[in-house]
C-alpha cells in the first residue's frame, strides 16, 4: 500500500464532518490550533502546509484575502474544499518538499500545525517554505514536543514516547504512530529552520494548564511552536 493511500485510509473519517466553527480564545492557548490563531497574523495571502480539512485555515478567513491549503492526502483536501467552498480557498494536493504551483516570494504567512513530523525530507520542506515566503514573511509552525516532561518519564521507564498513537505508537493498523517520521525538540526544530535561512523570533509554549506551559516550554509545553521570519524587507 502506497503512503498516500495509507494517509487517505487513515483520514477517511474526515469526510462528512460538521461545518467549521470559530476557535474561541479564552486565556493562554491550550492546543496547537489556538496557539497559532492567537498570533496577530494578517496580510494578503496565507498558506497552510498540511491543511487537512481546512479547519485552521478557516480561522484566518477575515485576516487574509487568499487562503491557500497544501495537503498530501487527496481525501483530506476534498474535505477542505467542501468546508471552504464559499471562501477564497485554493487547494493544492502535494508535499511541502516541492511546491511548484507557488511562485517564489509570493506568500505573506505560512502556518503548519503538527505536519513537519510527517515529511520525509524536512530540510527540503524548510527550503521550499522559505522560497515561497516574501521577504519579511512569517512562518508559524508547531509539532509534538518529544522532550515534554511526560515523554521523558515514559522513556525513563523504558517505554517509547510516541506522539500520536497509544501503545508506543502501535495504536493504528494503518501507520506506525500516526505516520510520524521525526521527533523534535525546540532546539532541533530551530536548527532545521535556521539551516534553511529562517530567523527564529519566538518560542511559544502551550497546553491545557495555560501559561504554565510557557514558563519552561522545552520541558512543559506539549508542543514545540516557533515563529520564524524570512530575512529581508517586503517590497
Where are these regions (language model features)?
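Conserved SAM-binding loop
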Residues: 33-152, 186-190, 225-230
Amino acid at each position: 500500500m502506497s503512503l498516500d493511500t495509507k494517509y487517505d485510509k487513515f483520514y477517511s473519517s474526515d469526510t462528512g464532518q460538521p461545518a467549521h466553527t470559530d476557535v474561541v480564545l479564552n486565556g493562554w492557548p491550550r492546543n496547537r490550533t489556538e496557539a497559532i490563531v492567537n498570533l496577530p497574523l494578517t496580510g494578503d495571502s496565507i498558506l497552510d502546509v498540511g491543511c487537512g480539512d481546512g479547519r485552521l485555515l478557516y480561522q484566518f478567513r477575515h485576516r487574509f484575502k487568499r487562503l491557500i491549503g497544501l495537503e498530501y492526502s487527496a481525501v483530506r483536501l476534498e474535505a477542505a474544499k467542501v468546508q471552504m467552498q464559499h471562501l477564497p480557498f485554493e487547494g493544492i494536493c502535494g508535499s511541502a518538499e516541492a511546491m511548484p504551483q507557488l511562485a517564489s516570494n509570493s506568500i505573506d504567512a505560512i502556518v503548519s500545525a503538527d505536519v513537519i513530523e510527517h515529511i520525509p525530507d524536512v530540510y527540503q520542506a524548510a527550503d521550499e517554505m522559505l522560497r515561497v515566503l516574501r521577504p519579511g514573511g512569517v512562518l508559524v509552525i508547531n509539532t509534538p514536543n518529544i522532550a515534554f516532561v511526560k515523554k521523558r518519564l515514559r522513556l525513563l521507564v523504558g517505554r517509547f514516547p510516541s506522539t500520536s498513537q497509544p501503545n508506543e505508537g502501535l495504536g493504528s493498523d494503518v501507520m506506525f504512530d500516526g505516520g510520524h517520521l521525526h521527533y523534535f525538540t525546540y532546539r532541533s526544530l530551530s536548527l532545521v529552520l535556521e539551516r534553511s535561512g529562517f530567523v527564529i523570533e519566538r518560542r511559544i509554549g502551550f497546553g491545557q494548564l495555560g501559561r504554565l506551559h510557557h514558563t519552561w516550554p522545552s520541558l512543559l509545553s506539549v508542543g514545540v511552536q516557533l515563529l520564524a521570519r524570512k530575512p529581508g524587507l517586503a517590497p
